[in-house]
Curated annotation (Swiss-Prot):
It comes from Milk vetch dwarf virus (isolate N) (MDV). This is Protein U4. The chain crosses the membrane at residues 5-25. It is a single-pass membrane protein. Belongs to the nanovirus U4 protein family. It is found in: Membrane. The gene is DNA-U4.
Length: 108
């Protein structure tokens, strides 16, 4: 008798409040999709971008030698750190600024 009672009560709820059942089904589907894609959604909201533009990839591949404008002491220091194999444009600028600030504090 218990399964019949549960089925009857479920049908009664569906009959009286179909919007509740509809909301429950939509909530279940939305929760499943969020749980499935949580990592990708987290990255999207943290970076405020949905996709990386392809122009950045083209810009990085166009550079022939990223170490072309570096001073010899900077390249020597990068070799000691093991960073002389590949650098992106932003990393190169950051390391140049860092090296300049280090050399300025050394001179003072």
């Amino acid at each position: 008798m218990e399964p019949r009672f549960l089925l009857f009560s479920l049908l009664f709820v569906v009959f009286l409040q179909p919007a509740l059942v509809f909301n429950m089904v939509l909530g279940y589907i939305l929760g499943y999709l969020i749980k499935k894609n949580y990592a990708r959604l987290k990255v999207m909201f943290l970076t405020n971008t949905f996709e990386q533009p392809e122009e950045d990839d083209i810009h990085v591949s166009d550079e022939k030698n990223p170490f072309e404008g570096i001073d010899p002491d900077v390249s020597k220091h990068l070799k000691t750190l093991g960073l002389d194999t590949s650098l992106d444009g932003e990393d190169l600028e950051y390391l140049q600024r860092f090296w300049e600030s280090m050399s300025n504090t050394k001179k003072k």
